[in-house]
UniProtKB/Swiss-Prot annotation:
Domain Peptidase A1, first and last residues per copy: 82-503
Protein's recorded name: Aspartic proteinase A1
Gene Ontology biological process terms, A to Z: lipid metabolic process; proteolysis
Matches recorded under InterPro entries: Aspartic_peptidase_A1, Aspartic_peptidase_AS, PEPTIDASE_A1, Peptidase_aspartic_dom_sf, Phytepsin, SapB_1, SapB_2, Saposin-like
Residues at the active site: 100, 287
Keywords: Aspartyl protease, Disulfide bond, Glycoprotein, Hydrolase, Protease, Repeat, Signal, Vacuole, Zymogen
Sites where a glycan is attached: 397
Organism: Arabidopsis thaliana (Mouse-ear cress)
Role this protein plays: Involved in the breakdown of propeptides of storage proteins in protein-storage vacuoles. Possesses aspartic protease activity in vitro.
Record-linked PROSITE patterns: ASP_PROTEASE, PEPTIDASE_A1, SAP_B
Length: 506
C-alpha cells in the first residue's frame, strides 16, 4: 500500500534517514547498499498537521479489483523513511531517494520544475547535461496521502552503487505541490514493487537490473539496525541475503496479489490473547517506505487502549455505544450474524453482504476516492467497530457491564486526526506484547520495539507505532508492516519465487 490520496495523514516521528553509505559487491554476487540513520526533528510532524488540516481523521477506502495502484495514493512519507544515494545520467547526477517496496516508479525533481518550492530546495535532473539521455515525454502523475507529483517520463542510465542500469524509464517531476516534499530529507523515490502498480507501466529499476544481468539472483533483502547508538543504519542487499543479518530460518509466505508485496496474515494477539479480528483472514503488505505499522481502526484502537495510548474522544462512537450497545450485545448473544447486526438495527443501509468496512467513513467513488461526509456512514462504521469489540470481549467471558464499559473506553482511544497516539515513556515495562500471525508463526513485538521516541531529555515524547488505516473489501482489511515490524524482522523479497520471508533480525 502505500497508502495515498486517500490520505492517511499519519505522520509521526522518529525516523531513520537512510543515506547512502557504501555499495559493495561481494564474491557471492550480491550488491549492498549501506544505510545510515538520522533522527527526524519535530518539523515533519508539524508539516503533517498542516498538510492534513483539511482531512478527515478516520478513513475507509473501497478499492476495486483493478485498484492496485490506488493503495499508493494512501502513502505518507512524512513519518520515517530509509534513504540511499543513486545517480542518473552520464556523467552521474546524484540524488537521495527512498527505497520503497510499496511503490514501483522512480522519480526525481526536474530542472523544468519552475514553480514548486520543493524543487528549489532539492537537486534537479538536467537532461541537457547527460549524454545518455533519451527523450520520452509521456505525461505522469502520482497522488499520495500527503502530497503529489506530476511530470513526464524520460529515459537515462541509473547508477546504484557500481551497477549501471541502462535506458531506465523514470519520471521527471515538474510539479511537487504542498509541503510534504518541501520538508522531506529525500529528493525522490525509487520503487521496489511490482510493475503491475507502476504508473505508465514503466519497468521498475529492479526489473531492469535482472533483465540486464546485473544481479545473479532475483532476490533483495532489508536489514534495519534499530540500535540508535550505532552509526550503521542497516543494509539493503540486492541479489541475495546476508546470513549475518538474521537468526534462524525465514518464514516464507506467497505473494497473493502482484503489485505490492502483499500476503495473507492471520490473527492479531494482544498480550497473548487472540483478538479474532483476522480469523477469517487479512491481507498485509511489507512496506519499507512506511515507518509505522498500520491496520484497521477497530483493532488499532484495541491495541492503543491496551498500551495506554491517548487519542481523541469520538462522540459519534460513544453515542452509538450508549444507544445501541446493549442491543448489539443481545443480538450477538442470540447468535445473530455479526455482519447483519448494524443493518438490522438501522445504522447501516446494507446487510453486510458487501463486507464490513471497519472505519468511520467509507468511499463510494473508487475512481476519485472522495470521502463521504454523511453522519449515517459514521454511525454505521462506529456500529461495525462496536460489534467487533463486543465479540472480542464475549470470547473472554466478560460480564455485560464490563463489556459495555470497555467498549466506551475504546471509543475514547480512537486515534487522533493525525493518526498518532501518545504513550507514557515511563510505562513501557507495563505494556503488553503485540503479535502478528504470519505463515502460521507468531511474530512478537515488545513495547520497546513498537513505541517510538521523539526528542531527548525532558521534552522527549513516546508515540505508539500503531496507526489506523481502513481499506474496505475486497482489498481490505489491510495491514501495512513498515519499519516498526521490519526493524525487528529481517525481510526477504523473493521476486523469483514470488514470496516474502521474515526472520528475527540479528
Amino acid at each position: 500500500m502505500k497508502i495515498y490520496s486517500r490520505t492517511v495523514a499519519v505522520s509521526l516521528i522518529v525516523s531513520f534517514l537512510l543515506c547512502f553509505s557504501a555499495f559493495a559487491e561481494r564474491n557471492d554476487g550480491t550488491f549492498r547498499v549501506g544505510l545510515k540513520k538520522l533522527k527526524l526533528d519535530s518539523k515533519n510532524r508539524l508539516a503533517a498537521r498542516v498538510e492534513s488540516k483539511q482531512e478527515k481523521p478516520l478513513r475507509a477506502y473501497r478499492l476495486g479489483d483493478s485498484g492496485d495502484a490506488d493503495v499508493v495514493v494512501l502513502k505518507n512519507y512524512l513519518d520515517a523513511q530509509y534513504y540511499g544515494e543513486i545517480a542518473i545520467g552520464t556523467p552521474p547526477q546524484k540524488f537521495t531517494v527512498v527505497f520503497d517496496t510499496g511503490s514501483s516508479n522512480l522519480w526525481v525533481p526536474s530542472s523544468k520544475c519552475y514553480f514548486s518550492l520543493a524543487c528549489l530546495l532539492h537537486p534537479k535532473y538536467k537532461s541537457s547535461r547527460s549524454s545518455t539521455y533519451e527523450k520520452n515525454g509521456k505525461a505522469a502523475a502520482i497522488h499520495y496521502g500527503t502530497g503529489a507529483i506530476a511530470g513526464f517520463f524520460s529515459n537515462d542510465a541509473v547508477t546504484v552503487g557500481d551497477l549501471v542500469v541502462k535506458d531506465q524509464e523514470f519520471i521527471e517531476a515538474t510539479k511537487e505541490p504542498g509541503i510534504t516534499f518541501v520538508v522531506a530529507k529525500f529528493d525522490g523515490i525509487l520503487g521496489l514493487g511490482f510493475q503491475e502498480i507502476s504508473v505508465g507501466k514503466a519497468a521498475p529499476v529492479w526489473y531492469n537490473m535482472l533483465k540486464q544481468g546485473l544481479i545473479k539472483e532475483p532476490v533483495f533483502s532489508f536489514w534495519l539496525n534499530r540500535n540508535a547508538d550505532e552509526e550503521e543504519g542497516g543494509e539493503l542487499v540486492f541479489g541475495g541475503v546476508d546470513p549475518n543479518h538474521f537468526k534462524g530460518k525465514h518464514t516464507y509466505v506467497p505473494v497473493t496479489q502482484k503489485g505490492y508485496w502483499q500476503f495473507d496474515m492471520g490473527d492479531v494477539l494482544i498480550g497473548g490473547a487472540p483478538t479474532g479480528f483476522c480469523e477469517s483472514g487479512c491481507s498485509a503488505i511489507a512496506d519499507s517506505g512506511t515507518s509505522l505499522l498500520a491496520g484497521p481502526t477497530t483493532i488499532i484502537t484495541m491495541i492503543n487502549h491496551a498500551i495506554g495510548a491517548a487519542g481523541v474522544v469520538s462522540q459519534q462512537c460513544k453515542t452509538v455505544v450508549d444507544q445501541y450497545g446493549q442491543t448489539i450485545l443481545d443480538l450477538l448473544l442470540s447468535e445473530t450474524q455479526p455482519k447483519k447486526i448494524c443493518s438490522q438495527i438501522g445504522l447501516c443501509t446494507f446487510d453486510g453482504t458487501r463486507g464490513v468496512s471497519m472505519g468511520i467513513e467509507s468511499v463510494v467513488d473508487k475512481e476519485n476516492a472522495k470521502l463521504s461526509n454523511g453522519v449515517g456512514d459514521a454511525a454505521c462504521s462506529a456500529c461495525e467497530m462496536a460489534v467487533v469489540w463486543i465479540q472480542s470481549q464475549l470470547r473472554q467471558n466478560m460480564t455485560q457491564e464490563r463489556i459495555l464499559n470497555y467498549v466506551n473506553e475504546l471509543c475514547e482511544r480512537l486515534p487522533s486526526p493525525m493518526g498518532e497516539s501518545a504513550v507514557d515513556c515511563a510505562q513501557l515495562s507495563t505494556m503488553p506484547t503485540v503479535s502478528l500471525t504470519i505463515g502460521g508463526k507468531v511474530f512478537d513485538l515488545a513495547p520497546e520495539e513498537y513505541v517510538l521516541k521523539v526528542g531527548e531529555g525532558p521534552v522527549a515524547q513516546c508515540i505508539s507505532g500503531f496507526i489506523a488505516l481502513d481499506v474496505a473489501p475486497p482489498r481490505g482489511p489491510l495491514w501495512i508492516l513498515g519499519d516498526v515490524f521490519m526493524g525487528k524482522y529481517h525481510t526477504v523479497f523473493d521476486f523469483g519465487n514470488e514470496q516474502v520471508g521474515f526472520a528475527e533480525a540479528a
